[in-house]
Amino acid sequence: WSAATNTGNWSAATNTGNWSAATNTGNWSAATNTGDWSAATNTGDQSAATNTGNWSAATNTGDRSAATNTGKQSAATNTGNWSAATNTGDWSAATNTGKDGVAVSWGRRGKARGEKGCYLVLAEYDDSNNLVCAKMEKVDGERIKENTFYTLKNGEFAVAEEQGAGT
């Protein structure tokens, strides 16, 4: 039940326990969680928020930010430009709303969405959890729609059945 908060520039907030939260509101900040049920949030530019536990969320609202999750049922979200949202766990969702951003979801049931101009990177696995395909597409607003979660099916981008984050 820990919390670490920074409001100044060049700050770092870190949690290693469960049910934790790390928050930065200044520029050039980092917020990190390694426990389950954690949240790491940055609102400044050039920030990074990282979770390695299950049921986690990492969020950035500033430009040139990165949000990363490696646990199951996680969500990584960016609203600034030049941002990256990455998931490597199952049932994860990566969202990017900044122009020229990248949303990457490597989980078995991963999905990604973004604004027009963003790139989505997805992976597909077989029933034995072997990687079958990895693919990147640009959100063009026509073939790949804005603000729509996609997943890979048979090596092609397909609209995800569940549109909620982390489902």
Question: PLM features: what roles do these ranges have?
Answer:
Residues 1-97:
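Thr-biased low-complexity repeat/linker tracts and other Thr-enriched repetitive architectures
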Residues 81, 90-91, 97-102, 108-119:
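Glycine-anchored, exposed beta-strand/edge motif detector
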Residues 106, 110-167:
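Intrinsically disordered, low-complexity terminal regions
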